[in-house]
Amino acid sequence: MSNSKENKWRISVVTPTLRRPEEVDGLLKNLSAQQQLPIEVIVVDGAPEHENATELVVNRLRDSLPFAVYFIRHNGGTAIQRNVGIENAKGGLIALLDDDVRLEPDFLKKMVAVFSSDADSHVGGVVGYRTNRHFAAADSQRWRWYKRLRLLSVYEPGRYDFECGYPINNNMQPPFAGTREVDFMTTACAVWRREVFDSGLRFDPFFSNYGVLEDAHLSLRAGKRWKLLQCGDAHCIEMHSPNGREDRRKIGYKSVINYYYVFSDLAGPLSAGQQFRFWRFQAFELLRITMSAVRRRRLDDVRDVTGRLRAIGGLIRRTRRNERTLVINAKS
């Protein structure tokens, strides 16, 4: 990794993908319209060797793009794919972009302006504003219940609740100008100072195969040393492509296991109060999705509940094993 003075504000884009050739095509064309062009785009494809649709897209567009584009085949899930891209990036700034995100033409220029105004280099990362993802908590029945039952101790978008282990959805932030400080950043549209990664920080291998909350885990670890900001002037949209996504059973499972891992890793050892608040929140989520499955008769909700129950059972069994080990060690 190089970070010479002339390289300081040059941007490398890292994008993991899986079976989304059309989305990658759209992203590369979108990036070519940026007022401040990246020096390179690194596409890391998780598809097996015989599936070459995305590689063909990259090869077809390569010569017409105003930046270098590299194709790397590497599976293991988006967290591992991003690590591979980061290792190969040359820019002083590294943009982590999802393949289904489309940036406004001045997006990268606005991001660079935030970093260049940070004279003391305290800012480690800046996340953009997804204009099509905003919702108000008052309009969400789920979030109204969260507040009514006092399940959370903080409700500011972009903050992490260290009392119950839940990240507060950044999309609840109304449109704004300038920057504001956050605890975590999505990997959909964030730009990082390369020194953050030069220090050795990477996405945790725990999030291999299918990541849920890997972005918050990375951000919260980075936030121990660096300031993280959201730029309200750097606009983009997220199309939320249905292609290449896992089934709801795995998402439900990860929504328990990964949340517990992040909470215990960053706030542990967890107190009895933190454990209670974590499981109270998980119990509410299980009840909410179960009721949705009954009311709407949606198979996806049933799969979600099945995954959550499997995860809860696994964590309970692991806790009991750990307790037995402690007792045995105490007696020996």
Descriptions of predicted regions:
Residues 1-33:
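N-proximal low-complexity "stem/linker" segments adjacent to membrane-targeting elements
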Residues 106-155:
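Conserved donor NDP-sugar-binding/catalytic core segment of glycosyltransferases
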Residues 72-89:
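Glycine-rich, basic loop-to-helix element that forms the pyrophosphate-binding segment
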Residues 28-71, 116-118:
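Acidic donor-binding segment of Leloir-type glycosyltransferases
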Residues 250-258, 268-332:
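Non-catalytic, C-terminal membrane-associated alpha-helical segments of glycosyltransferases
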Residues 94:
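Short aromatic/hydrophobic "clamp" motif used to bind/position activated sugar donors
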Residues 79, 157-162, 168, 172-192, ...:
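A recurrent flexible, glycine/aromatic-enriched loop bordering the glycosyltransferase active site
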Residues 185-189, 209-218:
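Acidic donor-binding loop at a coil-to-helix junction in glycosyltransferase catalytic cores
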